[in-house]
């Protein structure tokens, strides 16, 4: 039997074994959207470092290893001893909202 003769019946049967269906003909809701999940984590991580990725970079822009970051007011782009850049508080900790 040729390769086409083997693959054709398999291709025809695949829609019958749809794992997205839960048996009653309804598709199961997706529990995760991995792309948006990882993007959300990146935004939270940037915000923790004093970065505001949503302000359109009206403030200081810092080229970090995870991409460009917009430093919040009272934050400056600083290079650490290991060579990585991040937004760090340039004044008193009370001047820099987290």
Swiss-Prot record:
Q: Which domain of life is it from?
A: Eukaryota
Q: In which tissues is it expressed?
A: Expressed by the venom duct.
Modification 4-carboxyglutamate occurs at: 63
Miscellaneous note, as given in the UniProt record, is: Negative results: has no effect on glutamate (NMDA) receptors, Kv1.1/KCNA1, Kv1.2/KCNA2, Kv1.6/KCNA6, Nav1.2/SCN2A and Nav1.4/SCN4A channels, and acetylcholine receptors alpha-9/alpha-10.
Provide the function of this protein. Answer: Injection of the synthetic peptide causes a hyperexcitable phenotype in mice greater than three weeks of age at lower doses, and lethargy at higher doses.
Q: What is known of its domains?
A: The cysteine framework is XIX (C-C-C-CCC-C-C-C-C).
Q: What is this protein called?
A: Conotoxin Di19A
Its lineage opens with:
Eukaryota, Metazoa, Spiralia, Lophotrochozoa, Mollusca
């Amino acid at each position: 039997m040729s390769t086409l003769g083997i693959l054709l019946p398999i291709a025809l049967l695949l829609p019958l074994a749809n794992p997205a269906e839960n048996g009653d003909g309804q598709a199961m809701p997706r529990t995760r959207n991995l792309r948006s999940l990882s993007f959300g984590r990146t935004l939270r991580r940037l915000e923790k470092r004093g970065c505001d990725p949503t302000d359109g970079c009206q403030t200081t822009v810092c080229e970090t290893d995870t991409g460009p970051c917009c430093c919040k007011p009272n934050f400056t782009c600083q290079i650490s001893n290991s060579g990585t850049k991040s937004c760090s508080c340039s004044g008193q900790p009370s001047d820099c909202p987290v």
